[in-house]
Amino acid sequence: MNAARMTTTQKLKRFNPLFAILTIGAMTAALFIAADSSANAAQSYKYSIALIGDMPYDAKGVTQTPNVINEINASRIDLTLFDGDTMSGKGDKCTDAAYPALKTGFFDKFFKPLFYTIGDNEWVDCDRAVKGGFDPLSRLALVRSNFFQKADGTYITLGNSMGTTPSRIGVMHDSAYPELQMFSYKGITYIIPHVPGSANNSAVATPTFKTYNDAAKDGDDVEYKARDAANVAWINKGFEKAIADGSAGVIVLVQANMDWEGYARDAAAPNNENTAAFANVKQALLTNTLKFKKPVLLQNGDEHWYQVDMPMNETAGKLVEKDKGSLVENFTRVQTFGSGFNHWVELIIDPHSTNLWTFKVHIVKENLDVHAAS
């Protein structure tokens, strides 16, 4: 996301140190055995993963992101979930050379496996003049060939440069959309659809939105509708797997903030989200969360400030606006740092605890902004 809703001061106020560590209660406590997608399933036990997104952005991000990577590599996490946007939407060019450079200069620097969902800045927004004026679909093809699947059909793994995690994480990919991934690991099912910001690449008619995004170039309903249907099918399949495996919880990774709040847009600086473009994915998440009954965690980036909330409300199985209907207590959303706020979140997962998810914020000392006293 590149049209920020909040000022820097407002964003900093949103981060309250009192909430740096918090737990979200599970709806059901039991003992579960992980059903990994490889032949050798491992018993589930407490472990940690890193949650990051929206980096490296611009010169500041290029300088600060290595500090984040170094902290993650020095930690005891098992893997990293990256919620997209490897470049800024306001100036980083979508050149052919940019993508392999990100592979070697960013993704390959992580010691443990990294799982990545595609952001809008990598392809949807590449038609903007400031990003080079490229055809978005040509950039999407480069994202796929550099980060997900080679021309010979071989799937690409990210991170794991030290080979320190067993290869038993058997990752499933959709045949038509290689970026759609799914796997089971230590009692948790991970589902990765492809849901970027900038209205999910749908054709948006709002004049202010189109002005912000270089007029009529924006959006492709043919691409959007096909991928949207694939996303819904993938989410359904992932939850079916979670139920069959007896998973203690489900984690879903997307890039876009899918506008759970439903508030009005600022016409002077229109936001990248469009509620209608995410409706089918959100409904699929609701339907499956209600059926699954156990804890579900949605991770997204896009906004660049850290936040944990329970944004899902429903009436008769349909989504309703926040604070209306009934709160879906087994659905939690975590939004990661990013852009000018280059820090990371540790998710501690304990399949045997009534508190399945515990969030621990890691503020990278070298990346702190200097604030003058008033």
Model-derived features: where do they sit?
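N-terminal active-site segment of His-dependent metallophosphoesterases
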Residues: 40-98, 247
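Active-site neighborhood of phospho(di)ester-bond hydrolases with catalytic His/Asp-centered motifs
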Residues: 51-53, 80-85, 114-119, 253-254, ...
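Active-site environment of divalent metal-dependent phosphoester hydrolases
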Residues: 58-59, 88-90, 118-127, 199-203, ...
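His/acidic metal-ligating clusters that form di-metal
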Residues: 72-79, 108, 191, 207-312
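Extended active-site neighborhood of metal-dependent phosphoesterases/phosphodiesterases
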Residues: 97-226, 313-348
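A short C-terminal boundary segment appended to hydrolase-like catalytic domains
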Residues: 345-374
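Bacterial N-terminal signal peptides
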Residues: 20-31
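N-terminal secretory signal peptides that target proteins for export/translocation
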Residues: 1-15
